[in-house]
């Protein structure tokens, strides 16, 4: 639905030009007027800050030239601050672009926002129902009702929900069991993390009136660096897929992990269940390792220090050891995990824990940022397996020019899924379910967890 824009984008018949009009007289939380040119600035920031989201927007005419420092602006975006008109020209038709315009990556920000620096502790002003009023990363963050959100509502964004509470304080606590105890004792109102496996049955049984399971569209997998030994050998990668036991990993999650062996998760267009590597089959896995006979058997296994993820890493480390590798487990802090393993200068990023949650409801979101060769970035990369398969990239690019509703497109995405798994670029093992658990003072029935954006903070309400 339209938010800051007056209506959904007007798309040219050839699918290469998108036109929008910004609503009039809207302001950011600090009182700065929201201008059409702020959209251009927001997209430019993605490339200057090496954002992992930049890969979505390189389909805009001139984006690559701007990213390479060959242009001062992105020529495919033109705006008029007087009329609010925004025109975006693409290099070709793109079946996902309407979704991309709704992502937080492209949310307008004023030009006073740092172009190429970290804004964690100095967040830009907000245009939504809440603003970030204080940050002490990574310990605390405070969100308060945006005093200027009325200008957005008055401009016509009537369908965008307003906040029910005046203030939300977020406090870091990596001990998930302690989080549960705090909610039970009504010291905390909500936990972002799912209820841990060792407390799940207790919470389900004793606090059923304020607990529920939540569906989520995601895939958990082990990445394998396909550009260096031993994972540059497909037989080694296939062996890992045969050896991994999704049910063993499900036990780590307390039964919240639905087993899988593919890229696309249930609920995503193009999903068709299949299993190329029936198992777990350690005999088959060891046979493939013997056939590959890798000369380099020294492997560093990466994971972060969140309890479930650490246990996943320990499981994977033990599995690789059983397969005859000299595996070293490297556990690092969760708040730097993705930037560390997504940096090509980080040594020994061989294999490890990874997951991906949908950015938007289109299968390209599970292929382009994670498996396209163009997504192998120097920093903030999400193609952790360094997959670079030109034939499959070409198919991915071809599908991008079509709409997901076009005849046969969903089937082609299902075929693309299988083609990547025939190359065993990942070892997927599960799709996680989440939880909502609230304190007694919260209105449980009003609380809403969005399938895409997770907890809707505007739905929080005190009884």
Regions picked out by a protein language model, each given a short descriptive name:
Residues 31-32, 38, 177-189, 206, ...:
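Short helices/loops that flank or line small-molecule/ion binding pockets
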Residues 1-13, 63-66, 103-134, 148, ...:
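Short, solvent-exposed loop/beta-turn-alpha elements that line the ligand-binding surface or hinge
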Residues 144, 232-323, 328, 386, ...:
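Append "and occasionally in soluble cytosolic enzymes with long acidic Gly/Pro-rich linkers
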Residues 19-21, 33, 38-40, 48, ...:
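Surface-exposed binding/hinge segments that line
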Residues 35-42, 83-87, 128-129, 162-167, ...:
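Alpha-helical secondary-structure segments
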Residues 95-101, 291-308, 348-355, 402-440:
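Bilobed periplasmic-binding protein-like "clamshell/Venus-flytrap" ligand-binding domains
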Residues 133-144, 169-228:
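Extracellular/periplasmic solute-recognition and catalytic clefts
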Residues 31, 321-374, 408-412:
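Periplasmic binding protein-like
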